[in-house]
C-alpha cells in the first residue's frame, strides 16, 4: 500500500517514507487511498493483550514493517513505560465509561503514539538506508511537546525542536517542557497562539523543501505532530482496546456498536477513531467535543469551516486551536478528490474559510455528532463527576464528559458511551480544584499538593518531581523568527 498526498494523489510514499517525511512536499498530509487494504476481522484481536493488538493493527496500517518487526518495535516502545501493561485501561464511571489515556510517562494521551514514533522513525531510516540526522519539528498546544521530547530524548540520529505558544499552555505543561533532559531536545516559546506555531512549522517544511535550505547539510526534517502518519497510527489501537475491554467485562456483545466521545483540537485523536471504524471496528457515532474554540462544532453541523473568529484561552488549552490540521485527511478520505482538497486548503489559507459540498456534509452527519462546552461547564462537570462517582477528571475530559451528556440527551437510543480521557487532572490542578469547589492557593505545584490532600488521588511521579528539576529551555521568539531559529539549530549541529 502506498500513501499519497491529500492535495496531489500522484505524490506517493511508502509507509516508511511517509513517517520520515512527516509532511508531503506539496504541504498535504500522507493518507491511504482507501481502507480496502487495511480492513480486517476485529474479533481476531478481542482476546489479545495490548502489545499483540498494537502489533496486529500497526502492521496493517504501516505495511513496510512485518508483524515480527512491528512486535519488536512495540515491545521496545512500551515496555516499562506505562503504569500498567494494559497501557490504556477502560473504567466505568456512572453509566458510561472512561478510556484512560494518561497512564504513560508524561501523563497525557500523546504518550501512546510518541513512545512508538521514535522507534518507527529509526526503523524507517534503516529500512530506507538514510544516514541524515532527522530534525523533528513539532508545534504543541501543551501535551505533544513534552511527550515528543520524552520519546525522542537521546535517540541517536535525531534532534527535536518543540514550539509552543508563549503563555498558552498550563504552568505544569510548560515546566514539563522547560525541564526536559536530553542533549538532542529543545523547547522554544512562540509569541502567538498554537495556530501561529503550527502554521509556522508548516511554512518551515515548505520553505526548506522549495528552496532546498538543508541541501547537503546532512539534516532532513520530519514531524512528531499527528500530521505524521506514524503519530496517528498508534492512536487507532486504543479504540480497539476499549471495545475489547467492554466485551471482556460483559458490558457489550461482539458486534454491538460503541459511541466514542473525544475532546478534540487538531482532529487527530478523533480521526484515529474514524480509521478504526473504517477498518471494521463496530463504532457508532464519533462525538467531537470542543471547548469555547468551537470551530469544529460549527463545521460538523453546517459544513462551513471559518477560522475567522476570536481565539479563547481556556482551562483546556490543548484544545485551543482554530485550524484543525487532520480534518484535511478526513475530507480527502470522504471525497477521494485531491483537487477539491487542495482548493479547500487554499481557501482556508487565503480567505480563512471554506465550505464543503452538500454530499460531503451528509456523510459527516452520518459519522459524527458535535458539541461544545465552555470553561464554566467544564468545571461544573469536574465537580459533578467527583461528587457523583468519586472520579477526578482533567479539564479536557470534563469538556468531553459534558458533551457526552448533551449527546445522550439528544440521542436517547445511543449505544454504550466511551469518553476518552486525555490527561491527568494534575496537569491542570487549579481549574480541577476549583471544579470540586476548593479555592486554589499558591503556585501550580502548591495547588497540585492541595488537590492531592483534598482528593487522595495519587500525583503521577513524573509531575510530582517537576518542582525540583532545573529549567533548561528558556527561548522565546516571534513567529516570524521560527525558520531562522531552525536553520541556526541545524547549522550548530554540524
Where are these regions (language model features)?
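PLP-dependent amino-acid enzyme catalytic core
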Residues: 1-494
Amino acid at each position: 500500500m502506498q500513501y499519497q498526498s491529500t492535495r496531489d494523489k500522484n505524490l506517493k510514499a511508502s509507509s516508511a517514507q511517509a513517517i520520515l517525511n512527516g509532511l508531503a512536499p506539496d504541504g498535504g498530509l500522507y493518507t491511504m487511498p482507501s481502507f480496502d487494504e487495511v480492513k480486517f476481522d476485529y474479533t481476531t484481536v478481542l482476546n489479545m493483550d495490548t502489545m499483540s493488538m498494537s502489533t496486529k493493527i500497526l502492521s496493517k496500517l504501516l505495511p513496510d514493517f512485518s508483524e515480527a518487526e512491528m512486535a519488536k518495535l512495540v515491545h521496545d516502545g512500551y515496555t516499562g513505560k506505562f503504569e500498567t501493561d494494559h497501557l490504556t485501561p477502560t473504567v466505568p464511571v456512572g453509566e458510561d465509561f472512561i478510556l484512560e489515556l494518561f497512564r504513560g510517562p508524561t501523563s497525557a494521551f500523546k504518550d501512546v503514539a510518541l513512545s512508538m514514533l521514535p522507534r518507527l522513525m529509526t526503523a524507517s531510516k534503516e529500512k530506507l538506508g538514510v544516514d541524515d540526522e532527522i530534525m523533528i519539528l513539532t508545534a504543541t498546544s501543551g501535551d505533544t511537546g513534552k511527550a515528543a521530547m520524552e520519546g525522542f530524548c537521546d535517540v541517536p540520529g535525531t534532534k527535536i525542536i518543540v514550539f509552543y505558544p508563549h503563555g498558552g499552555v498550563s504552568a505544569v505543561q510548560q515546566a514539563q517542557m522547560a525541564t526536559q533532559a536530553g542533549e538532542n531536545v529543545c523547547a522554544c516559546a512562540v509569541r502567538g497562539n498554537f495556530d501561529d506555531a503550527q502554521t509556522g512549522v508548516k511554512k518551515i517544511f515548505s520553505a526548506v523543501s522549495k528552496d532546498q535550505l538543508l541541501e547537503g547539510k546532512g539534516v532532513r526534517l520530519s514531524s512528531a505532530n499527528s500530521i505524521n502518519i506514524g503519530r496517528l497510527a498508534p492512536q487507532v489501537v486504543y479504540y480497539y482496546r476499549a471495545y475489547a475491554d467492554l466485551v471482556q467485562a460483559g458490558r457489550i456483545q461482539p458486534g454491538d456498536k460503541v459511541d466514542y466521545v473525544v475532546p478534540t483540537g487538531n482532529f487527530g485523536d478523533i480521526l484515529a477513531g474514524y480509521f478504526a471504524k473504517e477498518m471494521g471496528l463496530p463504532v457508532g457515532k464519533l462525538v467531537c467535543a470542543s471547548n469555547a474554540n468551537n470551530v469544529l462544532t460549527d463545521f460538523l453541523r453546517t459544513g462551513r469551516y471559518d477560522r475567522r473568529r476570536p481565539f479563547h484561552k481556556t482551562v483546556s488549552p490543548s484544545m485551543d486551536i482554530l485550524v484543525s490540521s487532520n480534518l484535511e485527511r478526513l475530507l480527502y478520505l470522504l471525497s477521494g478528490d485531491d483537487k477539491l482538497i487542495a482548493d479547500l486548503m487554499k481557501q482556508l489559507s487565503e480567505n480563512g474559510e471554506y465550505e464543503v459540498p452538500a454530499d460531503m456534509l451528509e456523510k459527516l452527519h452520518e459519522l459524527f455528532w458535535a458539541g461544545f462546552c465552555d470553561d464554566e461547564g467544564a468545571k461544573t462537570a469536574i465537580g459533578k463527576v467527583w461528587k457523583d462517582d468519586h472520579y477526578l477528571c482533567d479539564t479536557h475530559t470534563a469538556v468531553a464528559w459534558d458533551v457526552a451528556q448533551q449527546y445522550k440527551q439528544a440521542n436517547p437510543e445511543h449505544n454504550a458511551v466511551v469518553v476518552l480521557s486525555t490527561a491527568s487532572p494534575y496537569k491542570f490542578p487549579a481549574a480541577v480544584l476549583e471544579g470540586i469547589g476548593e479555592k486554589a492557593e499558591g503556585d501550580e505545584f502548591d495547588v497540585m499538593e492541595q488537590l492531592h490532600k483534598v482528593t487522595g488521588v495519587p500525583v503521577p511521579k513524573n509531575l510530582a518531581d517537576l518542582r525540583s528539576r532545573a529549567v533548561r529551555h528558556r527561548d522565546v521568539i516571534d513567529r516570524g523568527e521560527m525558520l531562522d531559529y531552525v536553520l541556526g539549530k541545524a547549522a550548530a549541529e554540524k
